[in-house]
């Protein structure tokens, strides 16, 4: 009986061990399948999230490379809505404006672009007058050019065979034919512009390289019309100009020392980042939040100056 008891005990032990091992294997298989299912659901969610921001096709709009090597897009002739009935007093009345076709830079002028111009024309680089942090954080070749006067922006565009856009051209390039508040629509969305309205959620503390926000492009595929640097335009500033502006191709009031700045900047509020928002600045002002881009008439052949 003693040996028989030992044998039975051994059989029970072996059988129990087998059952335990099978149970562990089944549990591990269950965990593995569950992890695979979780991974699959994460991938599906990621695809769903990315597909919620549809890829826009801008190929319908004609582009060209200007003489200084920068891409421009042709904004077609036609009407658009300018101003805002819900904005500041100088944005009213909201009205329809008609523009002939024009070209505009798809990206803001970079510091590298401006440095090339300054070197070829023997001009000094813009100086940063006031900045609370290390200036090197603003000075990178790939960042947007800033801190130049209105006259210096005009000189760059002339050197490149272009001009500054009019205020109306700038607004149409940003809004399209409708009256959207921001380049992508009516609701401000983090990650679509370098505008630190909610801290640094856009990924940049100060400036950003022009063209960093693919989902923040305007209806014509133009980058940074909302945020990064505000931009000089050709027009002088008149608070009441919209009330007397012509329907076709408005070019602003009589020249004066106050010029219009558009687009908001990297440190603006949602209100100031709106495409209809108008700013006024003395033409000799230099500011780390102000840069520019250039435009040209469709029928004008760019000057060869910049390619020499």
Where are these regions (language model features)?
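A short glycine-rich, aromatic-capped structural motif
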Residues: 9, 64-128, 148-151, 227
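Functional-site microenvironments in short loops/helix caps that host divalent-cation chemistry
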Residues: 81, 86, 124, 131-279, ...
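N-terminal Sec-pathway targeting helices
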Residues: 1-15
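Ser/Thr/Pro/Gly-rich low-complexity linker/stalk segments immediately outside membranes or between
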Residues: 27-56
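A short, compositionally biased domain-edge/stem linker segment
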Residues: 54-68
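Short, structured beta-strand segments at or near domain termini in extracellular proteins/domains
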Residues: 288-302
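Intrinsically disordered, low-complexity segments enriched in small/polar and acidic residues
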Residues: 39-40, 74, 306
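Short, P/G- and charge-enriched loop/turn segments at secondary-structure junctions
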Residues: 59-62, 89-93, 278-283
